[in-house]
Amino acid sequence: MNLLYAFGLFVLTAVAEVVGCYLPYLWLRQGKSPLLLVPAAGSLAVFAWLLTLHPTGAARTYAAYGGVYIAVALVWLWLVEGERPTTWDLVGALVAILGMAIIVLGPRR
């Protein structure tokens, strides 16, 4: 699998998970409609399906995916919630992305 394709797939997977978790948050914490649970469930189903498209073992996929998830969550924080990430948020995301790169690009037996 091409590295750019895999990274794009990780980003799509993360967006599906963030949307699937953010919509119930809106209902539970901000008093929005419980009907938001319907698209939330759909988004989480898409998230689970997207995870199956990665070619490596499930545990390695989840570990590598975590780095991208952190970065996408911080972009969401900024663009959707209107809160600019701190320097420490960005440093933490960079460390997570470096960890993801080691997992994805490391040699296999």
Swiss-Prot record:
The keyword Cell inner membrane belongs to this UniProt entry's keyword annotation: yes
Keyword Ligase: no
Any Gene Ontology CC annotation: plasma membrane
Membrane-protein topology: Multi-pass membrane protein
Major localization class: membrane
Transmembrane annotation, as ranges: 3-23, 33-53, 62-82, 87-107
InterPro entries the UniProt entry points to: UPF0060 (IPR003844)
Keywords: Cell inner membrane, Cell membrane, Membrane, Transmembrane, Transmembrane helix
SUPFAM superfamilies: Multidrug resistance efflux transporter EmrE
Compartment(s) of residence: Cell inner membrane
One protein family per Pfam: UPF0060
Family indicated by similarity: Belongs to the UPF0060 family.
PANTHER family: UPF0060 MEMBRANE PROTEIN YNFA
Family matches, as HAMAP family: UPF0060
Protein name from the UniProt record: UPF0060 membrane protein MXAN_4406
